[in-house]
Protein backbone atom coordinates (compact mmCIF):
# COMPACT_ATOMS: atom_id res chain seq x y z
CA UNK A 1 0.00 0.00 0.00
CA UNK A 2 1.65 3.20 -1.21
CA UNK A 3 1.09 6.12 1.15
CA UNK A 4 1.65 9.72 0.14
CA UNK A 5 4.09 11.43 2.52
CA UNK A 6 1.85 14.48 2.78
CA UNK A 7 -1.20 12.33 3.50
CA UNK A 8 0.78 10.36 6.09
CA UNK A 9 1.89 13.53 7.91
CA UNK A 10 -1.62 14.99 7.66
CA UNK A 11 -3.18 11.87 9.19
CA UNK A 12 -0.64 11.87 12.04
CA UNK A 13 -1.33 15.55 12.76
CA UNK A 14 -5.08 14.88 12.52
CA UNK A 15 -4.74 12.35 15.37
CA UNK A 16 -2.00 14.05 17.41
CA UNK A 17 -3.28 17.62 17.55
CA UNK A 18 -6.70 16.86 19.15
CA UNK A 19 -5.04 14.32 21.47
CA UNK A 20 -2.47 16.84 22.71
CA UNK A 21 -5.23 19.44 23.09
CA UNK A 22 -7.34 17.08 25.22
CA UNK A 23 -4.31 16.07 27.32
CA UNK A 24 -3.50 19.73 28.02
CA UNK A 25 -7.10 20.44 29.02
CA UNK A 26 -7.12 17.36 31.28
CA UNK A 27 -3.86 18.38 32.98
CA UNK A 28 -5.17 21.92 33.55
CA UNK A 29 -8.40 20.68 35.13
CA UNK A 30 -6.53 18.06 37.19
CA UNK A 31 -4.11 20.69 38.52
CA UNK A 32 -7.04 22.96 39.39
CA UNK A 33 -8.74 20.13 41.29
CA UNK A 34 -5.49 19.46 43.15
CA UNK A 35 -5.23 23.10 44.18
CA UNK A 36 -8.82 23.05 45.48
CA UNK A 37 -8.11 20.03 47.67
CA UNK A 38 -4.95 21.41 49.31
UniProtKB/Swiss-Prot annotation:
UniProt KW keywords: Membrane, Photosynthesis, Photosystem II, Reaction center, Thylakoid, Transmembrane, Transmembrane helix
GO cellular component: photosystem II; plasma membrane-derived thylakoid membrane
Top-level taxon in the UniProt lineage: Bacteria
Compartments, as annotated in UniProt: Cellular thylakoid membrane
SUPFAM superfamilies, per database record: Photosystem II reaction center protein M, PsbM
Topology of this chain in the membrane: Single-pass membrane protein
InterPro entries listed in its UniProt record: PSII_PsbM (IPR007826), PSII_PsbM_sf (IPR037269)
Main location class: membrane
Transmembrane domains' residue ranges: 7-27
Gene Ontology terms describing biological process: photosynthesis, light reaction
Keyword Transmembrane appears in the UniProt entry: yes
Function: One of the components of the core complex of photosystem II (PSII). PSII is a light-driven water:plastoquinone oxidoreductase that uses light energy to abstract electrons from H(2)O, generating O(2) and a proton gradient subsequently used for ATP formation. It consists of a core antenna complex that captures photons, and an electron transfer chain that converts photonic excitation into a charge separation. This subunit is found at the monomer-monomer interface.
The protein's assembly and partners: PSII is composed of 1 copy each of membrane proteins PsbA, PsbB, PsbC, PsbD, PsbE, PsbF, PsbH, PsbI, PsbJ, PsbK, PsbL, PsbM, PsbT, PsbX, PsbY, PsbZ, Psb30/Ycf12, peripheral proteins PsbO, CyanoQ (PsbQ), PsbU, PsbV and a large number of cofactors. It forms dimeric complexes.
Family, per entry: Belongs to the PsbM family.
Protein name (record): Photosystem II reaction center protein M
Gene: psbM
Amino acid sequence: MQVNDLGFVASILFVLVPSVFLIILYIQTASREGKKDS
